[in-house]
Amino acid sequence: MSGKVANATPKAAAGKPRLSAAGGGAYRRTSSGPLPSAGGGGGRASSESGVSSRVRVAVRLRPRNADELAADADFGDCVELQPELKRLKLRKNNWESETYEFDEVLTEFASQKRVYEVVAKPVVESVLEGYNGTVMAYGQTGTGKTFTLGRLGEEDTAARGIMVRAMEDILADITPETDTVSVSYLQLYMEMIQDLLDPVNDNIAIVEDPRTGDVSLPGATVVEVRDQKSFVDLLRIGEAHRVAANTKLNTESSRSHALLMVNVRRAVKGKHEMDVSISGENGHSSSMVGSLRPPIVRKSKLVVVDLAGSERIDKSGSEGHTLEEAKSINLSLSALGKCINALAENSPHVPVRDSKLTRLLKDSFGGTARTSLVVTIGPSPRHRGETTSTIMFGQRAMKVENMVKLKEEFDYKSLCRRLDIELDKLIAENERQRKYFDDEIERITAEAQLRVTEAEREYKISLENEKAKYHQEYLDSIKILEEKWKIHQQSPKKLIKETEPTSSEVGEVQNLLQNEKVLRQSAEDEANDLKNQVLHWKKMEAAATAEVVKLRKMLDTEASQKEKLDEEIAVLKSQLLQLSLDADETRRSLDRGDGSGKIFPGFDSLMSHSRNSQPREQSNGPKPPIAKLFEQVGLQKILSLLESEEPDVRVHAVKVVANLAAEEANQEKIVEAGGLTSLLMLLRSSEDETIRRVAAGAIANLAMNETNQDLIMAQGGVSLLSMTASDAEDPQTLRMVAGAIANLCGNDKLQTRLRGEGGIKALLGMVKCGHPDVLAQVARGIANFAKCESRAATQGNKVGKSLLIDDGALPWIVKNANNEAAPIRRHIELALCHLAQHEVNSKDIISEGALWELVRISRDCSREDIRMLAYRTLTSSPTLQSEMRRLRIEC
């Protein structure tokens, strides 16, 4: 990609919205609305209302790389761009395609400058005006996300990414004397937030304000940036510490999500000023002109997010620790996708707490930030699925609405510094005024002292005169009072003598009245107690009567339910017995070879081609007895009979479950109801050969489903099947066990675990039986295992010798390659061809004599597909060709 260096954006007046400097394809930024009023108290002046702003999404196509030019030379691109219509066509095949519209479509020839002006510049301008902004890149591994965002452009200035160009515009627009720009550079690696500028700080905690919901990282390193060179040096340091790995899709695949946080703090000029004048008594005055209101600053944040690429394990070839990294990346991207879906569908609940990535991007999607998303895709048709997923992510993101808000705060620090200067001036002025006041006070104090002394002398003379006058009046009043007291002293004695008899009578009456009151109160209390006791006993009697009636009703109900359950159990036992007899009769008919009637599905399902060849019943025909029982009784009751203490009931129940498991429609219901766990428990605990045989057959039927195969492995099914095979003597039991293991051998994901838990050795151990049916199932299992190994080796997912050869299966394969039984011979021939396809097995093929069998198969095999496979294997293997030339063998 090429392009000229982006010109610095000229400064714009604060508070005025600006248009994007991009060309005709760039979109116009929505109006930010009027600035909030600076009036009112408090420490925050942020706007409470916001402007709705949709997430803007652009798609960028990466040109073909060298590998794609070589591998896809005969194929066209899977995408077709229509940039003039802002549309993208995704081809499903040569005839069908789907069209998607985006805010901008960038071809593989789009320059870095063009990408910046379309995607990031409107967001950067919003950040300079005081709004939060987010620029994010999303896409598959190796599609150019880091190139788009984090390219430093040291060798080619035209290749500079969004991070470098955004900082150039920010530094060009701010005023260094009043504005500040600070940077933090982080990575989210394995769900841990690590500081790329300080690698020691490798587990930073996320702090969420409980009042506003804002997310912050107080432990992250924050570096103030003054010039572009220091910012580029910081990016270089951060990129050196970022985790990367070599995968099949990208030699320098980022294994973490990188977040560049740019905090911009700008002062807003105001005119809130007031004159304050201070005057002294002597006429001197000092005036202070300043703003009593703190200055307003706008704080905004630009977040540039370089997401790690989503990848499929089978395509990237991740393994070991790289596999764990890929799992963590996919989990966090999955959580982000869930949040985008919830926001796009206006869901009441958005699961932002499912991942640290979604918590960090909480403000970017559905929050208050202006967000631009660039989705990067590749042209290769091999990655059509990943390209489709990326495009659909961008389509859903376009439905997300953010409420953009302007954040202004009072700058109390600046106000404090200015007030400190004013305070120093006032202190000096105060000292001058204080000296003047002290001198004036001394003069006034001296004058006042003289006046006080004269007033005290005059007051003292007046006080003496008044004192003498009042003393004489006091003596006269005392004499008058003494005379009145003597007169009144004689009157009370006469009054006491007259009132003594009356006082004694009143006292006796009062005592009698008091006693009567006490007796009356006691009687009333006793009567109330008796009433309460009578009421209490009446309530208890009524409650006891109601309880007796209730218990009688419950007893009658329980008795009737017991009778119904006994009758139902008797009916179920008779139905199970009849069905078991029918199944046994059918099985005996099958053993006799008459071929009439429907064979026992549980055992027949071991051979998938036989089961598929049976004609299905007509929808209007009568249902089989098993289906009728399943509808009438219910699966849960049938499974509960597996734990019956009566052996006959348990045998019949497991046969019914085995027949139900033969139908694919019933398998999911059996597993959900716990049937698989119950069957494995029977293998573990039962000593009855019949129960273990039928249980193994039911497990074999369930093992036809890939989901059930994972559950069987997770619950130790292979170990239980191996143990059953070692204890069994009946060939039919061994046939069922071998069939179950053979079905598990057909799963690519389970091969290592299957071998580790003894599955292959259990198969080889069952060949001692010698029964043709058992040998046919063993041969089928070995053929399935060899086919999966061959497919994995072809895809590059497996190296090294075959696990079958390591476990000693090759001698038995060679020995039975020309078996008289057609099913055994067909599976053995197929297994031998798949083993020989992997070059690393060639020496063992030769040493065990399997080369002659391959030559025989290529000449005499009755099936043309196996014969051609053997021929291609012999002609494509250099080792086998060399040995054939040595032995003078011709194909």
UniProtKB/Swiss-Prot annotation:
Comp. bias regions, Basic and acidic residues: 586-595
Gene Ontology cellular component annotations, sorted alphabetically: cytoplasm; kinesin complex; microtubule
Short motif (D-BOX): ranges: 370-378
Binding site for ATP: 139-146
Ranges of Low complexity composition bias in the record: 45-54
Placement of ARM repeats on the sequence: 623-662, 664-704, 706-746, 748-787
One Pfam family linked to the record: Arm
Keywords: ATP-binding, Coiled coil, Cytoplasm, Cytoskeleton, Microtubule, Motor protein, Nucleotide-binding, Repeat
Domain Kinesin motor: 54-400
GO molecular function: ATP binding; ATP hydrolysis activity; microtubule binding; plus-end-directed microtubule motor activity
Listed GO biological process terms: cytoskeleton-dependent intracellular transport; microtubule-based movement
Localization per Swiss-Prot or TrEMBL: Cytoplasm, Cytoskeleton
Biased segments, Polar residues type: 607-621
Disordered: annotated span: 1-54, 586-626
Coiled coil location: 502-592
Record-stated family: Belongs to the TRAFAC class myosin-kinesin ATPase superfamily. Kinesin family. Ungrouped subfamily.
Domain notes: D-BOX motif functions as a recognition motif for the ubiquitination machinery.
Protein name (record): Kinesin-like protein KIN-UB
